[in-house]
Every structure is written in structure tokens, then in C-alpha cells.
Amino acid sequence: MTARRCPIALAAALGISAAFAATAAAQAPALSSAMAPAPLSARLSADAPPVQVAPRAPGAKTMLLKYGPMTIKPGQNLIAVDLLKERPAVDGWITGFRPGMIRVKDAASPPVSQLHLHHAVWLVDWVPTFASGEEKTWIDASPGYAWKYTTRQHWLLNHMIHNLTPTPDQVYLTMEIDFIPADAPEAQGIKEITTRWMDVQGLKPYPVFDVKRGAGKNGKYVYPDDAPDAYKGAPRVRNRWVVDHDATLVGTIGHVHPGGLNTDLWLERGGKKVNLFRSDAHYFDPAGPISWDVGMTVTRPEWKVAVKKGDVMSVTTTYETRRGAWYEVMGIMPVGITKTPDGGVDPFTGQVDRRGVLSHGRLPENIDSGGKPNPGLSNPLRLRDGPYVDRIVIKNFAFDQGDLSRSSRAGRPAVVARGKSLLFVNRDPELTVFHTITGCKAPCNKTAGIGFPLADGAPFDSGELGYGPVVNLDSLIKDSDDERVPITAAAQRTTWRTPKNLNRGTYTYFCRVHPFMRGAFRVK
């Protein structure tokens, strides 16, 4: 599939590419063995939740839809919105959804330490409906329910793919769906559900927040509960939704980033508040919550909750805070909801089945390989002082002084006098290559992965140095309350200064976007 210029106003404003879907949707191919994803490992630890793969709904056919090919440039960390062309050619019902990302050259899922699917959100008529992070949770409607599909719908894809390497690559984003044509006998009696998007940051293109090391209580930080100013200046509390019709909730899942422990869905009525479901992050790696080697628990097929108009639904998320700080993280819980009431447990008088299951086993591409000895990086604690400097320039994915990958004088830690600060300047393409200066524990010189380095050193972080567009969402997305928000992770600046109150010593840092980049400076 090739990409053409997106004719809609948002795309024109952002300068993004798109594959335009004409009024007639393209025929999507049925899934063949050659196109099927690699088998998933089901090797789980003894304490893991059970894996429960939902059977395909009667009459459903599995189709693999692809978007691309997309060229992911070296160091890329951008958000784009594209129109989707490859879709079912007839009206019908979607009963299952399995996301993925594959390389063009070999149809294999790339290791997360090389190409990272930060997020992909499939929007139907501007409403977030299906989504994926690196954990790639499978989504299946409970028996008898489905998402309605028509060829008249506008389907868009909001996606963000990190290239953690200095070399380009090409990928497809994939969406494997179970689809029942509207005229099939099995389509009779299907009950329509839609997706209610619950996010601790509300509806934003980049809905993130930061978790500081040591924040919260007993090594855990609950957002927004532990952030009194979480929504300061916002017109409403972003993590809440007032239910606008009597309905039945029929499923939900959670999404967190490394460091995340769970998400919680809550319901309030008449001064009472109950928990509807906790989506737990199960980390397959024994190292725990420091990587994308994770699966999120989902509700069981029998989970049904009756809600009433005027109820208040909300979402919270919990992160650990002993291992490190966690920057630009998320807490999201999409919820399947009916258009009319269809039974279910009243959570204030009955018992909701809150037991969760995993939708799949361990994903080979998410197994982390970082944290091993790396002879290509120096130990800055053993190096002599470099020169006194007042600035460090970042260019070609390297620091001009104190870069641990350099063996020359330029590899020695830059020196700054106590009470002064160092200025970091990003001289890589400021609209496409963003860098951070994030403190890590010295010597911070092992191989890069997702679980290494961590933000476990001095508590400083520059944000992503670079520039990106902003957009008025209020007129584009239903229920958005943002007038002007950034579309990318860029901090809207290319410079940052170290804190002036750092004590004497050697400080190591890395780039969160490109973790192979390491540097050091000394305060004397």
C-alpha cells in the first residue's frame, strides 16, 4: 500500500502522509498461513494469570489488514495520523482484534529494543475504537456482541513508532480482525457495542505524565490520586466520564508503560464508589516491571456490568517508584459498552467477577536483551577529567564531550563548576530527531535495551529536545476539552540546562529515545 497526501484539514495542518480511502473500501485479504503472525509462547510462571484465548465467533472470518509500508527513519519518534485504505469491502461486524507490527523485508515482528510500537489507535469517525501498545493485547467481544462496521465509516490510524537505532527500517502495522458480513445468517441478533475510551489524561494525541522516583506511598504511585495538581487548569477532571445512557459494560483492558503495575476502573453512584476491574501488568521477565516484556489482564467473557445514566466512571493507574523514575507514561482502559441496557450485574448490589486473564502468552519480540557488559562504552568513574565547558552539543546521535562511546579526549567527562550549569543543545534535525538528557546510575555503561538504562540516577530529565506541531482538538474529537495540544512528544525547545544545585561528583546520563547514547559530566 502506498501513501498519498491526506486531504483532510488536520493532515494538511500537520503535514502528515496518509493512504486515502475513497468511498468504496478496498477488499482486505483473508488471513493465510503465510501472513499469520509467528506463534506465541505460552510458557508462563507459576504465578501468572491464565491465558484464555477466545474462540472465533460463529460465522466470522479472519482477515489481516495492513497499513504501510512505512519507512521509520533513524531515531524517529513521531506521531502521525493516517487514513486507512485496506478495510473490509462490505458492511458487517467486528468480533475480534489482534494488533501487530511486522518488518517489510521478512514479515517478522522486530525486537522492541530496535523498533518500538509506542502506540497505535484505530479511530472510527474520530472515535478511538481499537488500540495497541507494545504488549499487543488481543481484544475479543463477548459472545453475542460486536463492533458495527460500515464502508461509509472514516477509519484513521494514530500511530507512534520509535526507531531506537541510527539506521532506517520499513514496517507494516497490522490489524487481524474476525469479521462477520452483515448479510450472513450469523449476523442476525448481534448486539452492537462501542468503545468508551477511559484515559487518566483524557482524549489527547499524546496522553502522558511523569512518575518521579520515590513518589507516592510504599513504593507505589497512583495517578491521579497522588498528584493533587494533575488537572490544574483543565476545564474538567480528565479521568472521569459521566455515563450518558443506561447501558451494559461488556469488557475492558488496561495499558501501562514499563514501571506500570495496573489500571483500575471505578464507578460512583449516590456517594458510593466500587471497583469494576483491575487490569494487572504481568511481567514475564524475572527482572520485573522495567521492560515491555509484559501482558495485561483482560476481563473474562462473562464480565457484564449494568450502569445507569448519571453514574460516574473513572480510571486510575499505579506505577512502582523504587526502581527508577518513569517519564512519559500512560494509564488507559478502553471499555466496551452497549447502546441500550442488556442486563449485567449491578455493582452496588451484586458481585462483579473481577478475575482477569491474559489474552496471549509471552511475545518473543518483547524479550529484553539489555544490561549486558558492553566493551564499547567506557566507565566514566575511571576516566580523567575532561575540559571545563559550558555547553554540550548533540549531533549525529553523539555528545561532543563526555560521550562514553568515544575513546579520545572527547570521551572524558565534561567538567562544570559547582553552582553552575551545563547547557545541552540538540543539533540533530529538530523536527524529527528528539533527544533527552536523563540521569542514570553510574557507570551506566551496559548494553542498551528497554530495561537498561533506567532513570535511576540523579533526578534530572530534559524532556524530548525538539519541536513539533500543535493542534486544536476541541473541534475535531468528541469529548476532547483541549484547545491546543502538541501532536508529538517534543518539548518545544532544543536546549536544556542541568540543575545548578548538583553536588560534587560524576553524573551519567542517557537518551530515553535512543538508549545507546550515553554521556557523563563532573561537578567540581
Give the predicted meaning of each segment.
Residues R4, G260-D264, N445, R518-F521:
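Short amphipathic alpha-helical segments with coiled-coil-like heptad repeat character
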Residues A18-M35:
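C-terminal region of N-terminal signal peptides and the immediate post-cleavage residues
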